[in-house]
Every structure is written in C-alpha cells, then in structure tokens.
Amino acid sequence: YYQTRLHMCHVSTRGAIEAIQMAKLRGAPVTCEVTPHHLWFTNDTCDYRVNPPIRTADDVQALIDAIRSGVVDAIATDHAPHSAEEKARPLTRAPSGMVGLETSLAVTLTALYHTGKMELTEIVRRMTVNPASILGLSKGRLALGNDADIVIFDPNEEWTVDPEQFASK
C-alpha cells in the first residue's frame, strides 16, 4: 500500500462511494468528485448517454449523503458537448457526454440547495475552494495573490435551459 495521491473523477455509484470512504478511513490520500447531472437525474427519469451512465435513485442518494458527510470532496462538471449531428447517431455510434459548464451551478442548486439538502456556502465550497485545493491552484477563494475569479448569482433566480443560448455546443 503506497501513499500515492489518487483523485477519483465522476464517481456515480454507492459502491464507489463505499470504497472511497473505506480508503479515507484507512488514511489513504484519496479525493473524489461527483458531477451535477449524477446528483439530479436517475436512470428511470431520463435516457441521456453519458459516461459514467446516469444511475439509480439509490446511487443518487448515496452521492448526496457522501457530499453531506464529507466523503465527496468536490462537485465538478463533466463538460462534454457534442454536435446535434453526433448525438443523433444510433446509440452505439453516438459519443457520450452532455453540456455541463453552463448548467452545473443551476443543476447543483436544484438538486441540493432548493431541496434543503445542503447550505449554499457548502455548495460553493465544493464547486470552488475544494477543487482548487485538490489541484493546487491559487483559485477558489478571494485572497491576496489568488486569481480574482468571481461569480455573482441569485440562487433563487429561475431560468429555462435553452441550448440555443449556450456558448459551448
């Protein structure tokens, strides 16, 4: 057993969460992230082709519980847009992925904040401070010497997702 850092991307199942939790309890330097779409969609409510696939309601609940308990360190987009022509191909020939960059905050707020499952400050931490810390970047917080990246938003503003308005397609 080596003390090598490991970051698990796009964790999406209860089993993966359990394995990560066990590794952390043993002191392994493991971090992980989940995607907003794996916190909101379930395989019985949508038929999106993403990798890893959209999972069961039980898996979604396990991810949410793991975020709340601190097992999950970050919430990060799996931004993988494809053209309409690519996505219209038969399932076995279509690339997996979905636009995530422009919807990640809204989906996360819908799944966690507006359902009362997580405070806004914790969501912001998991989407900014923690990812920057994991990657060793001078970002994610307003501090002397850090990049002054800032987003101002109204967590209660409602809007309709319109793919025609996306900057990334």
Residue ranges and their predicted role:
Residues D44, P53-R55, D59, S96, ...:
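Short capping/connector residues at structural and topological boundaries
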Residues A57, A132-L135, K169:
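Short gly/ser/thr-rich secondary-structure transition/capping motifs
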